[in-house]
Amino acid sequence: MATLVYFSSLSENTHRFIVRLNLPARRIPLDSSQQLQVSEPYILVVPSYGGGTRHGAVPKQVIQFLNDINNRQLIRGVIAAGNRNFGEAFCLAGDIIARKCHVPYLYRFELMGTSDDIANIYKGVTEFWQRQTAHS
C-alpha cells in the first residue's frame, strides 16, 4: 500500500489522528527550512486554518511541499481536517488542494476525528489504493 503524507501543527491533532489510523505515513516538517521529498504516490492529509476565511486555509508548509513539482506529481488524493466552527470554511484546505492538484477529495473530519472517521478512512484508503493498483 502506498503512503499518507500529512501536516500537523503544534496542536498535534492531525498527528494523533494519523497515529490512530495506523497506516504508513510521512510528516511534512513544521520547520519550513526542512524539506520532505516523496518518491511514491501518496494521499495528503491536511488541516485547514484561517479561522473561517479562504486566506490562509492551506498551511504554508503544505504549500511549500506541493510547490515541489515531484511532490505535486505524486499526489493521488486529499483528506482534510477542520473545525466546524469555521462554518463554510470547514476543511477548506481539502477543497483548494483537490481543485488545484486535480485529485479526488476523499474525506473530511473534525479536529482529531471520531472512531467512525478512523474506520471509514482506513477502509476508504485501503480500497482506494487497491483500485489504483488495479489500474496501473
Swiss-Prot record:
Gene3D superfamilies: 3.40.50.360. GO terms for molecular function: FMN binding. GO terms for biological process: protein modification process. It comes from the Bacteria. InterPro entries: Flavoprotein-like_sf, RNR_Ib_NrdI_bac, RNR_NrdI. Belongs to the NrdI family. Probably involved in ribonucleotide reductase function. This is Protein NrdI.
